[in-house]
Every structure is written in C-alpha cells, then in structure tokens.
Amino acid sequence: VKEALAQVAADPAIDLAEFDQEDRYDLNGNGNRDEPDGLIDHLMIFHSCVGEEAGGGDLGENAIWAHRWNLGAPYPIPGTSSPNGDFGGQFAAYDYTIQPIDAAAGVCAHEYGHDLGLPDEYDTKYSGKGEPVATWSIMSSGSWAGVIGGTEPTGFSPWAKEFLQASLGGNWLHGSNVQLADLNPRGNVYMLDQANDKGRNDDVVRINLPAKQVPLNPPYAGQYQYHGGKG
C-alpha cells in the first residue's frame, strides 16, 4: 500500500486534494464531516495479479486476497502537501481496499461496501452451515453472480440498504415493519417493487424477530457458574 502511495505522490498529474473532500471521522471534532481533513477519503488499490480469492494464478497462496483494512495509524504520504489535518503538512492515508487488476464489478463493489461500513454477509468462519442471504446480497456470494463470475453482481441486502440509509442519510428505503407474532400461519401478502424500480409499494419488508434464546449448560454443582463474557 505504501509503495502504491509513493507512486501516486510522484505523479504530477494527480491532485490528491480531489480525493480529500470528507472528514469521515470528524477528526477536528466540529461535527462537520463534509470538509477536507487531510486523509484520502476512499483509497482503492488494484494489484497486478489474480487475487487469491480467485485462485491466485501463478502466485497461488502468495497472491493478495481482496480485502479492506487499514495501515494501523494514519500514514503521512512523503512528497505531498496539504493545508488540512495534523499530519505534518502532508496528505495521509489510513484505511484502504485492495483488489486484483482483473477484478469484476462484483469484487470492487463488495470491497467498496466495506469502505462504507458494511460487514461481510457470508459465512466467514466457513462452518459449513452457510448463510441464508447467499447470492441475494453483493456482500455475500452475490458478488460472484453472472455467467462470468462477478460481472453481474446482485444488489445489496435489505439489511445493508437500511444500514447505508441510516449511516449516510437519505429517505429512499421504505417498507413495512412486521412483528413475528402478527404473521398469519396461512400466509401474509405484501407487495414489493423491484429493486431497480421505485414505485408505490414496499422496498423491503422487515420481520422483527424476538431476542435469540441461547441455552447455557447447567452448573457442574450448585446454582451459579462463571461466564467469560464471550461465546
């Protein structure tokens, strides 16, 4: 990542100020996130190899797996200058996404979804149980949809859309809110518009489930036992 940033800094045709329009973390604490802060807003790096998630090509397991992460701390970019932020008068980079140069739209959109705060919706533990959303979401295996994998990714899940609206603002997602107890055993009918068509019907239908009941093993002896707070 730092090598890529050095290449960017050395290119006179690139004005990094164009990519610093947001104060995503409100670094100066003034409540305004719509202002430059010295950090590159959305750093997307394309590496020149097949991604490990697609087999890795000649590099195999030594290839880079597409991911979103950060540099541990803001990294001032040598050879740059910025009047904003507190990075020694330089532009800085912090979080990033990286994907292969031959990445299809699905991988790029999936990683950018992480950049917007969305988590993976696939079974990251590979437990064998899989995930219910599967190809219905680009944050799951929907990022690989299409005759040529990843060229026709599916959309974001209802949960992801709700998250994006809540975190980024807007009033474009509307739908019914239903309690589980109100569902009719014989079925309920709700009209949904297609995801690519904004009509008068619901965009989503949310069914509120009760809190998950997690049975615990009884104490070995007595009435109480210690719990580690995890698991």
What positions do the PLM features span?
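Surface-exposed, low-complexity/disordered Ser/Thr/Gly/Pro/Asn-rich loops and linkers
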Residues: V1-D15, F19, P185-M191
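Extended amphipathic secondary-structure runs
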Residues: A4-I14, E35-L43, S48-E53
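Acidic, glycine-anchored loop motifs typical of Ca2+
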Residues: E18-D41
